[in-house]
């Protein structure tokens, strides 16, 4: 079968297009691979630099604490050979008098300033210490709350449930904070707890409520009118004087009890 010129041209263009497209895809993959490799190398270099910086930081801290700026070793004393010569000469000069006077004794160095520590650098050259090199404060800052570990160590066991139940008005506070001094805590412990005593200890809670025990015959009409005139205020405002001077309510099946304030602790908590 003989292909026509048009078919041959079409197949050639089709194959060339896909070949060129494949070459472009391969080139893009190769470029992305090179980019990732370069990025990995750069990250490794940065990691090595960070590790070196972390390794050198303790040395810098030691240098700054010794008095020299970090990163720079204390310079050697200048003209060391020149300084050694007079020292040896001076020692040779003093050999003969020591031999005449008695046994050899350790001779003090005549020039102690030669071996003295280097002077601390000026303030504008010194670098402030790192945050972790600051000395720990002996006393905690009173304006800030303690951390979790200190709070756990300072916390006291909770009080027994029975002791909480005996609290009359929910004023139980047994918290000794570290911010209070020992004197204040001792004074608070010496003071007795306040006693809340309900009134009318000789009577029960039902003594203030005058409920009808048994049905009684209704009062006549004039008595009803007088009783209505006496108690026109359905919700009277009770005071101490009224409580002392007011007579107890009359019992009767026809009248609802008037609410009287109860003193002391109620059952509703």
Curated annotation (Swiss-Prot):
Cytoplasmic side: 31-269
Skewed-composition ranges (Pro residues): 118-128
Protein location: Cell membrane; Postsynaptic cell membrane; Postsynaptic density membrane; Cytoplasm, Perinuclear region
Residue ranges, annotated region (Required for apoptosis induction): 146-269
Compositionally biased intervals (Basic residues): 108-117
Membrane-spanning parts: 10-30
Entry-linked InterPro entries: WW_domain-binding
Signal peptide: none
Assembly and binders: Forms a complex with NMDA receptor zeta subunit GRIN1 and epsilon subunit GRIN2B. Interacts with GRIN2B. Interacts with GRIN1; the interaction is reduced upon NMDA receptor activity. Found in a postsynaptic membrane complex with DLG4 and GRIN1. Interacts with DLG4 (via PDZ3 domain and to lesser degree via PDZ2 domain). Interacts with FBXW7. Found in a complex with JUN and FBXW7. Interacts with JUN and FBXW7; the interaction inhibits ubiquitination-mediated JUN degradation promoting its phosphorylation and transcriptional activity. Interacts with SRC.
Protein name per Swiss-Prot or TrEMBL: Proline-rich protein 7
């Amino acid at each position: 079968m003989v292909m026509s010129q048009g078919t041959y041209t079409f197949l050639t263009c089709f194959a060339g297009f896909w070949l060129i497209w494949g070459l472009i895809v391969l080139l893009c993959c190769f470029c992305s691979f090179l980019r990732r490799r370069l990025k990995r190398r750069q990250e490794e270099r940065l990691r090595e630099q960070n590790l070196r910086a972390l390794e050198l930081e303790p040395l810098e801290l030691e240098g700054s604490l010794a008095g020299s700026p970090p990163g720079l070793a204390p310079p050697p004393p200048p003209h060391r050979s020149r300084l050694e010569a007079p020292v040896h000469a001076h020692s040779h000069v003093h050999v003969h008098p020591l031999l005449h006077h008695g046994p050899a004794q350790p001779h003090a160095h005549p020039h102690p300033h030669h071996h003295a520590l280097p002077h601390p650098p000026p303030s504008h050259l010194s670098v402030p210490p790192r945050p972790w090199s600051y000395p720990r404060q002996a006393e905690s800052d009173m304006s800030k709350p303690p951390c979790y570990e200190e709070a756990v160590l300072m916390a006291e066991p909770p009080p027994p449930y029975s002791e909480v139940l005996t609290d009359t008005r929910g004023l139980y506070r047994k918290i000794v904070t570290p911010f209070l001094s020992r004197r204040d805590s001792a004074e608070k412990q010496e003071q007795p707890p306040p006693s809340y005593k309900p009134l009318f200890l000789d009577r029960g809670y039902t003594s203030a409520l005058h409920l009808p025990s048994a049905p009684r015959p209704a009062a006549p009409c004039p008595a009803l009118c007088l009783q209505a005139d006496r108690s026109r205020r359905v919700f009277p405002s009770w005071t101490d004087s009224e409580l002392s001077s007011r007579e107890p309510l009359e019992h009767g099946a026809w009248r609802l009890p008037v609410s009287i304030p109860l003193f002391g602790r109620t059952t509703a908590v």
